[in-house]
Amino acid sequence: MKAGATSMWASCCGLLNEVMGTGAVRGQQSGFAGATGPFRFTPNPEFSTYPPAATEGPNIVCKACGLSFSVFRKKHVCCDCKKDFCSVCSVLQENLRRCSTCHLLQETAFQRPQLMRLKVKDLRQYLILRNIPTDTCREKEDLVDLVLCHHGLGSEDDMDTSSLNSSRSQTSSFFTRSFFSNYTAPSATMSSFQGELMDGDQTSRSGVPAQVQSEITSANTEDDDDDDDEDDDDEEENAEDQNPGLSKERVRASLSDLSSLDDVEGMSVRQLKEILARNFVNYSGCCEKWELVEKVNRLYKENEENQKSYGERLQLQDEEDDSLCRICMDAVIDCVLLECGHMVTCTKCGKRMSECPICRQYVVRAVHVFKS
């Protein structure tokens, strides 16, 4: 048994020498010598059987939904807050990618009434994305003020660029106006210059360049056009001053504007249709004006009849109310209260009265009466 174990150990050592080298096998053999068994190894603290853990990079996720970016959720950077968002949580508008929060506030144009309609969480999320603390905000107005303040600071660069562009445009317009004024304003100088040219020699007249003459004529035509435009503006202003009601909204015609049937004939088709439309009369089948006139006449007559019948009903109702009991307002007055003699109640209510409701006199008896 010992010889077999020795031969097997020798073969293993030879294989290890071929693979790892002689020094490694000798180190292993020294470990075997100190061990209690023939196949036990001493633990090496510098050697680990597990591979080293790979260093994990920063896990970049979407700021809105918290999911990792993938093929279906591509990474996009918001042009306002400069944060990373996926394609689902961002909106593409005018070739600019914005997150849903920035897009929501951008739609309000940063107007206070529109911002007050938003939710508190949207305003708070907008400020958090820009690393603005919101701990001191207790009301919604505080968040809106903070958003407006931050937007004003953030738009200073835009204001600078716009002011630069405006200054450039002002300078360009100044030079343009000064250039044209040199040709348009001194019209007398131009005319005198033309007179000198006409009085001069033939050589001097022929030596005048055609470009100068064209500039002179164009300047004169521009002066005439400006004068015509000013005259037109003055005429429009005078017309508005004379007829101030034209600029206001025109009052629609109604049935109350008619005093008699003769007024219907003098109304236009538009006014007739307005009257019919306001009184819920269908005029879709009317092709001629006389058809509209007939409908308006019929409507006017029916309105007059309704007013008369309504007045008669009110009169009858007043008369009926005069004959009703003043207590129950249901039965007819058919009782006389004694000793005062007032007739203000029915028999049923008169028997229950202890005193007259008019003179407050004690009721001795309630007598039922019949009308002849």
Curated annotation (Swiss-Prot):
Domain (SAP): residue spans on this chain: 115-134, 264-278
Zn finger intervals (RING-type): 325-360
- What pathway does the annotation place this protein in? Protein modification; protein ubiquitination
Q: What does this protein do?
A: E3 ubiquitin-protein ligase that regulates several biological processes through the ubiquitin-mediated proteasomal degradation of various target proteins. Ubiquitinates the caspases CASP8 and CASP10, promoting their proteasomal degradation, to negatively regulate cell death downstream of death domain receptors in the extrinsic pathway of apoptosis. May mediate 'Lys-48'-linked polyubiquitination of RIPK1 and its subsequent proteasomal degradation thereby indirectly regulating the tumor necrosis factor-mediated signaling pathway.
**Zinc finger regions (FYVE-type), where?**
56-107
Q: Keywords of this protein's UniProt record, alphabetized? A: Apoptosis, Cell membrane, Cytoplasm, Membrane, Metal-binding, Nucleus, Phosphoprotein, Repeat, Transferase, Ubl conjugation, Ubl conjugation pathway, Zinc, Zinc-finger
Q: Which organism is it from?
A: Pongo abelii
A single Gene Ontology biological process assigned to it is: proteasome-mediated ubiquitin-dependent protein catabolic process
SUPFAM superfamilies attached here?
Answer: FYVE/PHD zinc finger (SSF57903), RING/U-box (SSF57850), SAP domain (SSF68906)
Cite the post-translational modification comment. Answer: Autoubiquitinated (in vitro). Proteolytically cleaved by caspases upon induction of apoptosis by TNF.
Q: Which residues carry this modification: Phosphoserine?
A: S169, S254, S256
Q: What is its EC number?
A: 2.3.2.27
Subcellular location per the Swiss-Prot or TrEMBL entry: Cell membrane; Endomembrane system; Nucleus; Nucleus speckle
Site for Cleavage, residues: D231, D232
How this chain assembles, per its entry, is: Interacts with CASP8 and CASP10. Interacts with p53/TP53; involved in p53/TP53 ubiquitination. Interacts (via RING-type zinc finger) with MDM2; the interaction stabilizes MDM2. Interacts (via RING-type zinc finger) with PPARGC1A. Interacts with NOD1.
Where do Acidic residues bias regions lie?
A: 221-240
Q: Which PANTHER family match?
A: CASPASE REGULATOR, RING FINGER DOMAIN-CONTAINING (PTHR14879), E3 UBIQUITIN-PROTEIN LIGASE RNF34 (PTHR14879:SF3)
Q: Give the region (Disordered) as residue ranges.
A: 194-252
Q: Which reaction does it catalyse?
A: S-ubiquitinyl-[E2 ubiquitin-conjugating enzyme]-L-cysteine + [acceptor protein]-L-lysine = [E2 ubiquitin-conjugating enzyme]-L-cysteine + N(6)-ubiquitinyl-[acceptor protein]-L-lysine
The beginning of the lineage is: Eukaryota, Metazoa, Chordata, Craniata, Vertebrata
**Topology class, membrane:** Peripheral membrane protein
Any GO CC annotation of this UniProt entry: cytoplasm
Q: Does the keyword Ubl conjugation apply?
A: yes
User: What name does the UniProt record give this protein?
Assistant: E3 ubiquitin-protein ligase RNF34
Question: Which gene is transcribed and translated to give this protein?
Answer: RNF34
